[in-house]
Amino acid sequence: RIRCYQMLDKLVREHIILGVDPGTLFMGYALLHTIGSKVEILDFGVYDVHKLDDQYARLQKEFFFLQEIIDKYHPTVLAIESQFVDKNPQTMIKIVHAQGVAIAAALSKDVPVVEYSPMKVKMAITGNGHADKHQVADMLQRFLHIPEKRMPKKLDATDALGIAYCHYLQLGMPQMQ
């Protein structure tokens, strides 16, 4: 599924990275298109299911939404945040359910999955594994030249963008301008 191109006597790879920040009420998603060392944002945002009362209906909506995104953009990989230990076990279980739904949606469309811990994402983007969400969003805005008016209000979207960008950096092809 990885596409390759001959450019300037070099073989370069093209990737479409789907980043997902799983959640039970809001799911962040982002799509990055990379060719060699070039990276551009195809789409990013938050899928909102908070108005549905039934937790399983929310998971079903997230599953179908991700399948639609996969059908539209044909990502070559799903990069998803691995779960951290939460103080509230019930919260953690619900988030793990959302993570499982995202992974199942990708695998049902033959999209491979990679996981990154929140600390790894923060370290890759800011150089500090304990950076806060606003610091990560600020760095992504700089690296990806996102105009202020396009920055989302909900940080779930920039979290997903950070996960996708972290995977891009792991490919060993960063171009920071």
Residue ranges with predicted function:
Residues 1-177:
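Phosphate- and other anionic-substrate recognition elements at nucleic-acid/protein interfaces
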